[in-house]
Amino acid sequence: MAKKVQAYVKLQVAAGMANPSPPVGPALGQQGVNIMEFCKAFNAKTDSIEKGLPIPVVITVYADRSFTFITKTPPAAVLLKKAAGIKSGSGKPNKDKVGKISRAQLQEIAQTKAADMTGADIEAMTRSIEGTARSMGLVVED
């Protein structure tokens, strides 16, 4: 018989940098999970990813205090900022443009996000990423 699920915990943790301090410690401590076991497993799984990149993770906690977790791809906004070489998006995206990004870079980001996005095809995903870029104050160049 399958294990009984006690809770789902959603967090964003820096790749390769999970430690028992907030937000990881309190979120998992409330569920009675072995925090260090999660930190070691997460850091081992994300060691191939650029260190410090925020990685969304969904942790399934079972009634016997065991857990499994699924890592997702970094948020589109983080990938866009990295590709454009900017620190943050624009406070007024329609007036103040903070950088430029090419359509090829958008397609590359869409390919990266393809595993997590539910878009019908790569073109639809690219358009979705393009909308995120525009809302951040980035100019999309052909």
UniProtKB/Swiss-Prot annotation:
The lineage of its organism: Bacteria, Pseudomonadati, Pseudomonadota, Gammaproteobacteria, Enterobacterales. Belongs to the universal ribosomal protein uL11 family. Keywords: Methylation, Ribonucleoprotein, Ribosomal protein, RNA-binding, rRNA-binding. It holds the Pfam family Ribosomal_L11_N. InterPro entries: Ribosomal_uL11 (IPR000911), Ribosomal_uL11_bac-typ (IPR006519), Ribosomal_uL11_C (IPR020783), Ribosomal_uL11_C_sf (IPR036769), Ribosomal_uL11_CS (IPR020785), Ribosomal_uL11_N (IPR020784), Ribosomal_uL11_N_sf (IPR036796). GO terms for biological process: translation. This is Large ribosomal subunit protein uL11. SUPFAM superfamilies: Ribosomal L11/L12e N-terminal domain, Ribosomal protein L11, C-terminal domain.
